[in-house]
Curated annotation (Swiss-Prot):
GO biological process, alphabetically ordered: glandular epithelial cell maturation; lung alveolus development; maintenance of protein location in nucleus; negative regulation of gene expression; ovulation from ovarian follicle; paracrine signaling; progesterone receptor signaling pathway; regulation of epithelial cell proliferation
Region named AF2: 684-930
Segments for region (Disordered): 1-133, 148-260, 334-356, 415-454
Chain positions recorded as progesterone binding sites: 763
Gene that encodes it: PGR
Span list, region Modulating, Pro-Rich: 1-565
Family: Belongs to the nuclear hormone receptor family. NR3 subfamily.
DNA-binding region: 566-640
PTM-bearing positions, type Phosphoserine: 20, 82, 131, 191, 212, 293, 344, 399, 673
Protein name as it appears in the record: Progesterone receptor
Coiled-coil region(s): none
Region AF1, residue ranges: 457-547
């Protein structure tokens, strides 16, 4: 026995180059099962490893099974246990083990390279196995993982003796007429526990050797040889993609072959973690194709473990049908039950991160046939095309998933047909160049399964939100939402999926969310179980808006009949009933009641677009209240218990939330015909109520006698606080933040005085019936105090506004809409940067004012007259506010002489904008010509 030391092995994973035979031999003789990941050198640079004594004699060539002699007729003795132990790295062979002889390492290195080069390199025409150039021409070699595929015909290892790593063929050693077999690249990312031998098209899977009923003892051939017909090479995890189908290709990795005829085959361990059925090796018997090496073969294709729970009963039945009905011809291997078919989303997908779903590329040396049978177990990473918003994804992630229900398989009954929706358009199918994939002759028992599946269909999980898809018909089908130009609502309504079993069986049109079907079976990855009402357990979170009863009806009536039940329209939680006119949960019901009765002034810290769901519904009360008002919740709606009888009048047909707000057209204008239904406050007006500022105090000391300077100073401090309140209110105003930031600042600076005096008139009208000027709770001026002040004439001018409110009996809804229009009533002469958005927003609030008028006026004539009176009041405010601007600017200029204090922010606005306004550099927007 010869004891050698291998020095400086190169990394076997070097792309584009082959490792030296020394490192191949040293790794082949390593410990067979070190763990799931065998340590290896991965860098290009060579690294010095510890000297490993390698016992060549008796380990490189295993003796054939008992009862057979080597070709030269010698009789061999089985190796001692010490010889076998000497093959493990880190274990020194005993000095007297066998008849070993020591050679200097420098002499043995060349001999070892020559022997391993001859042994491991595949033979080819005109090639010498002892030539080092041959090793360089061959693709990089690689090593087996700890778990190898099992060969049922191989003789198992017994009595703790390890199975030999290589098998010597019985044929003459000098035969070199065979050609290098084409090899397949193991997909990258494949875990070591799934490293299986890949089939080579046209190669025999295992030599025709009958399995021995008795365990064969492992014997080692001590004879030296210079040539070997087969090639033994393990698969490499993470090997680069193969560019060609031959072993001579620069990027192709050779595939380890099975045992030669008469040799002891490889007996790897079975991995019990994966119970997926595999094609029996006993059926992979095919003649040797001309020009192929009998050893260049494989066991079975790699297995993709299903990522979803399976119907075990159906899978077992389908596997039994495959095993009983498969046939092989022409040396082509059958398609694995877990191999993706051509045209599947994963067949041509990009590399997937992770080790369970590798990126597979096969050399184009065998084209699969078109009649390959689509199997149930074709699981690949699903190609998901999800166009959902964030709350939809989170709602789906929180929902329990029921993939396959237990029970009878629908495919077992020929008369049972599931209405599978037509799959969405996919990219053109690219035929995969996959060696070893051939047609599978389906048995009669499998015909019922294939009859319910579309040709070439696999697991296609394509969940998409089809905004442009035609709406389906059915009891829960939404009516199409027209574009704004065609007289439709401005709300981004999302359709509800019609997933009832009766609707699908009756052949209804496909839902907007197509169900996930697998060969006509219940869908995977989506709810298969439904509620007793026929509605799915999980709904889309976009159920904020009501659906119209009929598209053809001219009156914009809305009902709850088309809404799903048992789901809160605000947060998506389980609804407890219809509260305040909307189907909500108990939490949202209590929140809305407290928010509306307590008159809280909630402000959003973000952009008024916070997500309101079951988990985050308490984060932002402002957005939650906005969503409640948007859904149509009103305190007067508590009396309506039967939600399928409630009608919401003119609520969602004109103005939309979220932003932007659309421009009205002829078909969208509100008519003033009397309605027979119960009239509720429109949602946008409810939102305006919720964002109305709280009561602001002036901080005036009423215990001291009034002076001109003290009153003006208190009014200036009140104006500063009201100016800050206007800024916060405008930011919460729907549509205002869609404008350019410069336009927002300009509009506030031009309109802050109008908003203050208009609010003064409303407070005076509501609290003191217009008899006094109600500036603040701590600053109320009656007529006597007005006369004592230095601005009595100005007080009389401001007093006209509450008197007009008393005369017209302005409602709160009308006041809120008029207040927004005052913000949008003055623009620069050159216009705004976002002029189109401004006009769109202003037109929308004009229509809101019309709807607010329609809540009280029942006739067209009376409603039109009131609209004229209110808009005339807005026009008259321009002249009144101009007087206030002039007085304010004069007081600001003489502030030191008058001992009047002006706060900083108010001073900046007065100095920057009032001269422009008084100079006529602004353009007032009037409703009526003077």
């Amino acid at each position: 026995m010869t004891e050698l030391k291998a020095k400086e092995p190169r990394a076997p994973h070097v792309a584009g180059g082959a490792p030296s035979p020394t490192e191949v031999g040293s790794q082949l003789l390593g410990r067979p099962d070190p763990g799931p990941f065998q340590g290896s050198q991965t860098s290009e640079a060579s690294s010095v490893v510890s000297a490993i004594p390698i016992s060549l004699d008796g380990l490189l060539f295993p003796r054939p099974c008992q009862g057979q002699n080597p070709p030269d007729g010698k009789t061999q003795d089985p190796p001692s246990l010490s010889d076998v132990e000497g093959a493990f790295p880190g274990v020194e062979a005993p000095e007297g083990a066998g008849d070993s002889s020591s050679r200097p390492p420098e002499k043995d290195s060349g001999l070892l390279d020559s022997v391993l080069d001859t042994l491991l390199a595949p033979s080819g025409p005109g090639q010498s196995h002892a030539s080092p150039a041959t090793c360089e021409a061959i693709s990089p070699w690689c090593l087996f993982g700890p778990d190898l595929p099992e060969d049922p015909r191989a003789a198992p290892a017994t009595k703790g003796v390890l199975a030999p790593l290589m098998s010597r063929p019985e044929d003459k050693a000098g035969d070199s007429s065979g050609t290098a077999a084409a090899h397949k690249v193991l997909p990258r990312g494949l875990s070591p526990s799934r490293q299986l031998l890949l089939p080579s098209s046209g190669s025999p899977h295992w030599p025709a050797v009958k399995p021995s009923p008795q365990p064969a003892a492992v014997q080692v051939d001590e004879e030296d040889s210079s040539e070997s017909e087969g090639t033994v090479g393990p698969l490499l995890k993470g090997q680069p993609r193969a560019l060609g189908g031959t072993a001579a290709g620069g990027g192709a990795a050779p595939v380890a072959s099975g045992a030669a005829a008469g040799g002891v085959a490889l007996v790897p361990k079975e991995d019990s973690r994966f119970s997926a059925p595999r094609v029996s090796l006993a059926e992979q018997d095919a003649p040797v194709a001309p020009g192929r090496s009998p050893l260049a073969t494989s066991v079975v294709d790699f297995i993709h473990v299903p990522i979803l729970p399976l119907n075990h009963a159906f899978l077992a039945t389908r596997t039994r049908q495959l095993l009983e009905g498969e046939s092989y011809d022409g040396g082509a291997a059958a398609a694995s039950p877990f191999v993706p078919q051509r045209g599947s989303p994963s067949a041509s997908s990009t590399p997937v991160a992770g080790g369970d779903f590798p990126d597979c590329t096969y050399p184009p040396d065998a084209e699969p046939k078109d009649d390959a049978f689509p199997l149930y177990g074709d699981f690949q990473p699903p190609a998901l095309k999800i166009k959902e918003e964030e709350e939809a994804a989170e709602a789906a992630a929180r929902s329990p998933r029921t993939y396959l229900v237990a029970g009878a398989n629908p495919a077992a009954f020929p008369d049972f047909q599931l209405a599978a929706p037509p799959p969405p358009s996919l990219p053109p199918r690219v035929p995969s160049s996959r060696p070893g994939e051939a047609a599978v002759a389906a048995s009669p028992g499998s015909a019922s399964v294939s009859s319910s599946s579309s040709s070439g269909s696999t697991l296609e999980c394509i969940l998409y939100k089809a905004e442009g898809a035609p709406p389906q018909q059915g009891p829960f089908a939404p009516l199409p939402c027209k574009p704004p130009g065609a007289g439709a609502c401005l709300l981004p309504r999302d359709g509800l999926p019609s997933t009832s079993a009766s609707g699908a069986a009756a052949g209804a049109a496909p839902a907007l969310y197509p169900t996930l079907g697998l060969n006509g079976l219940p869908q995977l990855g989506y709810q298969a179980a439904v509620l007793k009402e026929g509605l799915p357990q999980v709904y889309t979170p976009y159920l904020n808006y009501l659906r119209p009863d009929s598209e053809a009806s001219q009156s914009p009536q809305y009902s709850f009949e088309s809404l799903p039940q048992k789901i809160c329209l605000i947060c998506g939680d389980e609804a407890s009933g219809c509260h305040y006119g909307v189907l909500t949960c108990g939490s949202c019901k209590v929140f809305f009641k407290r928010a509306m009765e307590g008159q809280h002034n909630y402000l959003c810290a973000g952009r008024n677009d916070c997500i309101v769901d079951k988990i985050r519904r308490k984060n932002c009360p402002a957005c939650r209240l906005r969503k409640c008002c948007q859904a149509g919740m009103v305190l007067g709606g508590r009396k309506f218990k039967k939600f399928n009888k409630v009608r919401v009048m003119r609520a969602l047909d004109a103005v939309a939330l979220p932003q932007p707000v659309g421009i009205p057209n002829e078909s969208q204008r509100i008519t003033f015909s009397p309605s027979q239904e119960i009239q509720l406050i429109p949602p946008l007006i409810n939102l305006l109520m919720s964002i109305e500022p709280d009561v602001i105090y002036a901080g005036h000391d009423n215990t001291k006698p009034d002076t001109s300077s003290s009153l003006l100073t208190s009014l200036n401090q009140l104006g500063e606080r009201q100016l800050l309140s206007v800024v916060k209110w405008s930011k919460s105003l729907p549509g205002f933040r869609n404008l350019h930031i410069d336009d927002q600042i300009t509009l506030i600076q031009y309109s802050w005085m109008s908003l203050m005096v208009f609010g003064l008139g409303w407070r005076s009208y509501k609290h003191v019936s217009g008899q006094m000027l109600y500036f603040a709770p701590d600053l109320i001026l009656n007529e006597q105090r007005m006369k004592e002040s230095s601005f009595y004439s100005l007080c009389l001018t401001m007093w006209q506004i509450p008197q007009e409110f008393v005369k017209l009996q302005v409602s709160q809804e009308e006041f809120l809409c008029m207040k927004v229009l005052l913000l949008l009533n003055t623009i620069p002469l050159e216009g705004l940067r976002s002029q189109s958005q401004f006009e769109e927003m202003r037109s929308s609030y004009i229509r809101e004012l019309i709807k607010a008028i329609g809540l009280r006026q029942k006739g067209v004539v009376s409603s039109s007259q009131r609209f004229y009176q209110l808009t005339k009041l807005l026009d008259n405010l321009h002249d009144l506010v101009k007087q206030l601007h002039l007085y304010c600017l004069n007081t600001f200029i003489q502030s030191r002489a008058l001992s009047v204090e002006f706060p900083e922010m108010m001073s900046e606005v007065i100095a920057a904008q009032l001269p422009k306004i008084l100079a006529g550099m602004v353009k007032p927007l009037l409703f009526h010509k003077k």
